[in-house]
């Protein structure tokens, strides 16, 4: 009988900030909980009642904006791309496009949003991914995303 050992790869916030140019309040990936280079990445974003977006979206009934859910997924693809392609000092990954975005339910203060992105293909510096965001195992958003690797 063979036993395979799997090691979880975690990336903490300080390492994420070395990979992405985003900073508070626009860094939307709190922690990577596991990934496989060139294949997939799973990250979390904890939604606090103190998120700046809740001041205007909506004060009496705060809902995390869909565009920020997509941005969080895009940032997760950026982390996966950086880990896959060993980002150089003079390179940056830009969010290039989004297709087939679907929103299934609202994300509220107190939720932990789990972001799962999967590598599809890379061609001429453009990388295509699929992404799914869930809360408590329920899909809140899904989309296809592209990022472009360019000189900084």
From Swiss-Prot:
Name a single GO biological process: lipid A biosynthetic process
Supply the Pfam families for this chain: FabA
Molecular functions per Gene Ontology: (3R)-hydroxyacyl-[acyl-carrier-protein] dehydratase activity
Q: Where in the cell is it found?
A: Cytoplasm
Please tell me whether the keyword Iron is annotated for this protein: no
Q: Which GO cellular component terms are attached?
A: cytoplasm; membrane
| Reaction catalysis annotation | a (3R)-hydroxyacyl-[ACP] = a (2E)-enoyl-[ACP] + H2O
InterPro entries linked to this entry: FabA_FabZ (IPR013114), FabZ (IPR010084), HotDog_dom_sf (IPR029069)
Q: Which UniProt keywords apply?
A: Cytoplasm, Lipid A biosynthesis, Lipid biosynthesis, Lipid metabolism, Lyase
Active site (catalytic residues): 57
Enzyme Commission number: 4.2.1.59
**Alphabetized Gene3D superfamilies for the sequence:** Hotdog Thioesterase (3.10.129.10)
Q: What does this protein do?
A: Involved in unsaturated fatty acids biosynthesis. Catalyzes the dehydration of short chain beta-hydroxyacyl-ACPs and long chain saturated and unsaturated beta-hydroxyacyl-ACPs.
Q: Which family does it belong to?
A: Belongs to the thioester dehydratase family. FabZ subfamily.
Q: Per its record, how is this protein called by name?
A: 3-hydroxyacyl-[acyl-carrier-protein] dehydratase FabZ
UniProt organism field: Pasteurella multocida (strain Pm70)
């Amino acid at each position: 009988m063979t036993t395979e050992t799997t090691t979880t790869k975690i990336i903490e916030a300080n390492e994420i900030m070395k990979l992405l140019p985003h900073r508070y309040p626009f860094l939307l990936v709190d922690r990577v909980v596991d990934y496989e280079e060139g294949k997939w990445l799973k990250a979390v974003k904890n939604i606090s009642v103190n998120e700046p977006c809740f001041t205007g979206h909506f004060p009496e009934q705060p809902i995390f904006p869909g565009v920020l859910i997509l941005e969080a997924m895009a940032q997760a693809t950026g982390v996966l791309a950086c880990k896959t392609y060993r980002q150089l000092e003079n390179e940056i990954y830009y969010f290039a496009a989004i297709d087939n975005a679907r929103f299934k339910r609202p994300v509220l203060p107190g939720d932990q949003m789990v972001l799962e992105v999967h590598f599809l293909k890379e061609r001429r510096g453009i990388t295509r991914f699929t992404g799914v965001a869930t809360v408590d195992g329920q899909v809140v958003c899904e989309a296809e995303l592209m990022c472009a690797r360019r000189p900084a």
